[in-house]
Amino acid sequence: MVKRKNSDNSDTVAHGNYEAKVAEIEAIISRIESGELELEAVFEQFANAVEYLRQCDTFLQQRQQQMDLLIETLNDEDNSEL
């Protein structure tokens, strides 16, 4: 079983860490595809990649919500000027 860190920001990826997480996911995929890992290590690496993907997805969803709010604010400002 894979142990996960319990921290307040475990569900999010800091702005500077998004690219690092994506790079790590790509590295994990390369290690798995190389065929050189033992089966247990493959499962551990896969679990890590899934967790990183979940964190990246949460980060992107949060940023999408921020963008939607900004666009809505701009639209409201445009409509109030009419």
UniProtKB/Swiss-Prot annotation:
Gene Ontology biological process terms in this record: DNA catabolic process
Top-level EC class: hydrolase
Keywords annotated in UniProt: Cytoplasm, Exonuclease, Hydrolase, Nuclease
EC number(s) given by UniProt: 3.1.11.6
UniProt protein name: Exodeoxyribonuclease 7 small subunit
Major subcellular location class: cytoplasm
Catalyzed reactions per annotation: Exonucleolytic cleavage in either 5'- to 3'- or 3'- to 5'-direction to yield nucleoside 5'-phosphates
Ranges that cross the membrane: none
Family according to the record: Belongs to the XseB family.
UniProt entry tagged with the keyword Nuclease: yes
GO molecular function, one term: exodeoxyribonuclease VII activity
Gene3D superfamilies: Exonuclease VII, small subunit (1.10.287.1040)
Subunit structure: Heterooligomer composed of large and small subunits.
Subcellular location: Cytoplasm
Role of this protein: Bidirectionally degrades single-stranded DNA into large acid-insoluble oligonucleotides, which are then degraded further into small acid-soluble oligonucleotides.
Pfam family, one: Exonuc_VII_S
Source organism: Nostoc sp. (strain PCC 7120 / SAG 25.82 / UTEX 2576)
HAMAP family the record matches: Exonuc_7_S
Gene Ontology CC terms: cytosol; exodeoxyribonuclease VII complex
SUPFAM superfamilies found in the cross-reference section: XseB-like (SSF116842)
